[in-house]
Amino acid sequence: MKTLLLILGVVAFVYLEPGYTTNCFTCTTWTLSCREFEKCPPDKGTCFKRWNSTGIAIRRRYTRGCAAACPNPVGNEKVFCCVTDNCNK
């Protein structure tokens, strides 16, 4: 029984990922939709969505990506941040 537990422990240890990284939707240019996502580096585990808050909502353009911390809005921008996979849609 002890041998079985030891084997299960070793198998679990071998197949565990060394660290969890967040997946975020990403687009570096201002656009209406982002369909691509990236696996964020371990030091950038926050997803963000940034948009300009002026004008009609239907005409808003967005940027999305990974960040070490939630970016500060510039001018009339709004920023939404989250820390779960693909939460910045």
Curated annotation (Swiss-Prot):
GO CC annotation: extracellular region
Similarity comment: Belongs to the three-finger toxin family. Ancestral subfamily.
Pfam family, one: Toxin_cobra-type
Organism whose genome encodes this protein: Sistrurus catenatus edwardsii
Signal peptide limits: 1-16
Predominant subcellular localization, coarse grouping: secreted
Tissue and organ expression note: Expressed by the venom gland.
Localization terms from the record: Secreted
Protein name: Three-finger toxin 3
Molecular-function annotations in GO: toxin activity
Disulfide bonding pattern of the chain: C24-C47, C40-C66, C70-C81, C82-C87
Record-linked InterPro entries: Snake_3FTx, Snake_toxin-like_sf, Snake_toxin_con_site, Toxin_cobra-type
Gene3D superfamilies in the record: CD59
Keyword field: Disulfide bond, Secreted, Signal, Toxin
